[in-house]
Amino acid sequence: MALDCLLLFLLASAVAAMEETLMDTRTATAELGWTANPASGWEEVSGYDENLNTIRTYQVCNVFEPNQNNWLLTTFINRRGAHRIYTEMRFTVRDCSSLPNVPGSCKETFNLYYYETDSVIATKKSAFWSEAPYLKVDTIAADESFSQVDFGGRLMKVNTEVRSFGPLTRNGFYLAFQDYGACMSLLSVRVFFKKCPSIVQNFAVFPETMTGAESTSLVIARGTCIPNAEEVDVPIKLYCNGDGEWMVPIGRCTCKAGYEPENSVACKACPAGTFKASQEAEGCSHCPSNSRSPSEASPICTCRTGYYRADFDPPEVACTSVPSGPRNVISIVNETSIILEWHPPRETGGRDDVTYNIICKKCRADRRSCSRCDDNVEFVPRQLGLTECRVSISSLWAHTPYTFDIQAINGVSSKSPFPPQHVSVNITTNQAAPSTVPIMHQVSATMRSITLSWPQPEQPNGIILDYEIRYYEKEHNEFNSSMARSQTNTARIDGLRPGMVYVVQVRARTVAGYGKFSGKMCFQTLTDDDYKSELREQLPLIAGSAAAGVVFVVSLVAISIVCSRKRAYSKEAVYSDKLQHYSTGRGSPGMKIYIDPFTYEDPNEAVREFAKEIDVSFVKIEEVIGAGEFGEVYKGRLKLPGKREIYVAIKTLKAGYSEKQRRDFLSEASIMGQFDHPNIIRLEGVVTKSRPVMIITEFMENGALDSFLRQNDGQFTVIQLVGMLRGIAAGMKYLSEMNYVHRDLAARNILVNSNLVCKVSDFGLSRYLQDDTSDPTYTSSLGGKIPVRWTAPEAIAYRKFTSASDVWSYGIVMWEVMSFGERPYWDMSNQDVINAIEQDYRLPPPMDCPAALHQLMLDCWQKDRNSRPRFAEIVNTLDKMIRNPASLKTVATITAVPSQPLLDRSIPDFTAFTTVDDWLSAIKMVQYRDSFLTAGFTSLQLVTQMTSEDLLRIGVTLAGHQKKILSSIHSMRVQMNQSPSVMA
């Protein structure tokens, strides 16, 4: 109450500006003690004001004497921090014309001066009497003067004048009055300054504020919100003008949540049973249905037991409950497809956002145990968040029992500690056709044929009788397609046109009929030039083979002759000269060999020889997609004459480059231009005759492999991942056969197109690893920069880069792919990685990695580089895995490789975690933090009781993420069982 009264007082007192008096002669009861010079000038006398109060005044009237210069100096006046001073003077002046015989020197005005100083410097003995040290304020003239008649009638006409001066910076000042021939009386002098008063405005208190140094000055005053009020938007402030008045309000305060305004000067707490949710709300409101606020100042009403409020529900909305289960389920089974229909729940919980989730479980024949359905089961329109009471489920196993739980959920189901209400239905599927073939690979191609291979479907659902292949030219539609059949999982398609791209699909057939066609994949026949080039490359090999055959026959004849003559010539001298051996190089005669562009005397000649110059008018830049070592990378389009427009990636050379930077930039084009393989990034050409200089390559829609895998964690099958690895290995096989060593093979340098085809890229860094000083991936070794985690030990120690060291790097890429882009060696330092490798430690298998693939990784990581497989062997091994998917069923474990020490990414010590947030951060699943907390899993003890159905219910739908979280929960449960105190 006292505070409210104070605020009301401040508000009422804000009507007028405040004046603080520094000196007022009207209040003096003794002599003023001012200094006059000369003594015959100003005279202090006692008098009466208009109210007959006794006052001390000064008067002067030497009008009959010429050359008057009478000074009156006040005592020292302390300015008290004021910057501008006001002086109010009340005085009377005799009219000169009313004085008889007055000389012409009679005046009716006087001058006002001031002098700043930090201390008292003027006394009666040491006063200064000249205009020099003073600053003149003004010449003061009377508005009215009095005459002899007025004087006789005691009618004094009093003048009041106010003058201001400033800015002042010293501690105080003196005032001086100069008379130079007037007959006047200085009745009173009041010296004061102005300030803006304390005020309450917009629920904020503003303190007393002095005016500025100038009459036009505006002084900012920051306001303070009254109790239980808060600022809105910008900081609240007012401006104090030169007249001591408030103006230009900026910002405001309002009563905070739980408080409402009272008389515009106070914020009162909302009473029990009411609430105010935000500052913006006008006043308190009654609690909505199924909620209450037992105490005052409630910003929100809490829901009663069994009722909840969704995160997106405003506080004004009533609390609601969870729905009951769906009703009256109807199922329709068609081979391996099912249609489920049901009626909505009887109770919706008071909400209209009811949706449905389908939980699929595959069971044993006796239904005593069930497990989560495979990831390839398809739900139409979707599995989670269904808005209609119908779903179509396909790609189920044939002759298999299933249980489907249909959950009813609404916006508050995640708030309930209990699982959603559901209804279950048990179903057994019928005989079905095989599933789709996952992928196809090109074995070889001629001008008029293509040879393809593929693995059998993951769900054959019986014995595969044969395969049907559908193909057509890409420029046509599938209505013009042709068909071919094969008894095996390979086929040669003949009768094709040279240089054409064909779209191919394949499907398997069992006694139940044909399965669905596989996804569309594109393959191209050779052009006439390709065929002749291949023939030219193979001709020397054929000739060499024929020559070798002739030599072999001649050798046999010669040996027989020598043997027949051996006895006759046994006594002849034995030749003592040794045969001379000459090395002719590793490549077979006629094989295309990579040429280092830096062996050219003029590197620009290599660009002209290996890269096609493109007119810049054929190139259209669209958007920035990244930044490279030399400049920005763009997505664009290329339209060459006579060819269709295609999307391309455009690397540019930034402005201000040196000639060396230009050569280094274009060297990558000189390297890429020598390669022609479906798993090597294709160079379209270069632009060197205009600015900026550009390297134009094919556009890869899915970007770098490592980030692509992380974005799609758990969404690819093992056979799809093996298909990606096979493509990378095929590209590296091609490079190794050309005697090209990549040196920087890693998932970040593999690009992925829209068909999941992987292509080796980034040939610019392979020569200049030592020049990179910024990327932490590349660590110093022997004066250079090396990507330690991907590099073979001999390359780290001795900079010995070979195709065998690329094989080591390929093993790391395999590990990256099977772990969906996880960082090799995790958070180990580069030096720890080097030490571990030297001690023969190797990476363990990623989660759910087939044992055959991990064994291939270990083969690639043999310490003896000569013991590592060649890329041709790796391609053959992967092809066998693709043809026989059963070989990938066995999952690798650390204990399965006793002869090889493996690094063990230590399981986090769950006893060190105190919150669910800490645990999710440790296992890199922090994106699900809100889902866990919203669903009520707020402690680690509750988390250890979670199942796969719980994860699905809270929104963890990716299989890879589910496995990772469930594996961590299992480890946590084991640790907690071993340390019971953790559960406390």
Curated annotation (Swiss-Prot):
Keyword Cell division: no
EC number: 2.7.10.1
GO terms assigned for molecular function: ATP binding; axon guidance receptor activity; protein tyrosine kinase activity; protein-containing complex binding; transmembrane-ephrin receptor activity
Domain annotation Protein kinase: ranges: 619-882
Start and end residues of each SAM domain: 911-975
Cytoplasmic side: 564-984
Membrane spanning stretches: 541-563
A single GO cellular-component term on record: endoplasmic reticulum
PTM sites of type Phosphotyrosine: Y600, Y928
Subunit description: Heterotetramer upon binding of the ligand. The heterotetramer is composed of an ephrin dimer and a receptor dimer. Oligomerization is probably required to induce biological responses. Interacts with EPHB6; transphosphorylates EPHB6 to form an active signaling complex. Interacts with PICK1. Interacts (through Tyr-594) with NCK1 (via SH2 domain); activates the JUN cascade to regulate cell adhesion. The ligand-activated form interacts (through Tyr-928) with GRB7 and GRB10 (via SH2 domains). The ligand-activated form interacts (residues within the catalytic domain) with GRB2 (via SH2 domain).
Name of the protein in question: Ephrin type-B receptor 1
Organism: Rattus norvegicus
Gene name linked to the record: Ephb1
